[in-house]
């Protein structure tokens, strides 16, 4: 029951679904997700924590940087089935298509330029 509730919580917010689906093309740094969604770092970070707890997303840390990817291979079977369902159900969603266009631009940028949110003053 707990796993089900975590997954449904992860999928119950439009911003989390947008963040989740931004990972369709592969691993992203938190700052790339922030730039794509155009939300504050703390907001995106909290959403990514929920997705990780749900088992929908894997996280790795490299220095101050946090990288995320879909938990396709390592996730629990229920999380993997949920991911497949979301990908299929929302494949033609206009907001997600707009996010994909933004993300293509973000991916073309130098990662150091995008990760400016990690630089300390």
Where are these regions (language model features)?
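Short, low-complexity, intrinsically disordered N-terminal peptides in bacterial proteins
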Residues: 1-2, 121
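C-terminal regulatory/oligomerization modules of transcriptional regulators
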Residues: 25, 41, 53, 74-121
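Alpha-helical residues within the helix-turn-helix
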Residues: 35, 52-53
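N-terminal helix-turn-helix DNA-binding core of bacterial DNA-binding proteins
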Residues: 2-43, 65-75
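Short, hydrophobic-biased segments on the C-terminal half of alpha helices
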Residues: 48-49
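A cross-family signal for key residues in well-ordered alpha-helices
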Residues: 9, 18-21, 52, 58, ...
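Beta-hairpin "wing" of winged helix-turn-helix
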Residues: 53-62, 69-71
